[in-house]
Amino acid sequence: MLKTAFENLRSRSPLIHNITNYVTVNDCANMVLACGASPIMADDAAEVEEITAICGGLNINIGTLNSRTVTSMLLAGKKANQLGHPVVLDPVGAGASHLRTDTAFRLLREVQFTVIRGNISEIKTLASGAGTTKGVDADVADKVTEENLDNAVAFAKAFAARTGAVVAITGAIDIVADGERAFCIRNGHPMMSAVTGTGCQLSALTAAFCAANPDKPLEAAAAAVCAMGLAGEIAHARLTPLDGNATYRNYIIDAIYNMTPEQLEKGANYEVR
């Protein structure tokens, strides 16, 4: 299943429109290239509808939010919906400020998303209207653990059913769920949290997988999350004592570039609930 999703991505090479943040935009573009797709990073309202129309998928990331890009996100999201293109939302820091939270809610009201990907604090904020987001990282009280995994899975399924989107909650244990099934994924390495933008890269990667597998968004999102986590493991195994987080970032992108569908299928560590 994951193998097929990755094979489709490599063979179809979709063009992915990213309205993302300027902290990680270069890494996101390189991640899209590494997986076999092509990126375009356009965020001016005068062209986003045109750009979205020629792309196979759209990735919306609110990491460096401003009033100009909010307009662009709404225009692009609605155009993608009209065309039936998959749309990914990364609600970076939702709950940390009124602007971020209000914008995330407006996007959810006005755009139908294929996948909503965030940490547990961000997703809980979207689901409940309140949260304890600490910057853009999950608050320590909101970690998904083996002890609370059943409850977290039930929460993810309920939110997915309510929104009609696949919900991807990423952390030490990742959950990717629709209203009926959930993938619990245990790939990755703790050092990934030392690299700014691994989540942003994952959202761009998810948009690429979804564009190449439009009829199977749950499996596409799960494949993206497994691939990113596996890349984190492979990259960490390459590090020498003199390497740090910048080298690790590059090795993660390299790992996706060099990853084969067979390697993903073999290395993915998940269960379905």
Regions inferred by a protein language model and the residue ranges of each:
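Active-site cofactor/substrate anionic-group-binding motifs, chiefly glycine-
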Residues: M31, C35-G84, L89
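Glycine/small-residue-rich loop that forms an oxyanion/phosphate-binding "nest" at active or ligand-binding sites
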Residues: T69-G118
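Conserved phosphate/ATP/ADP-binding segment of small-molecule kinases
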Residues: R100-A182
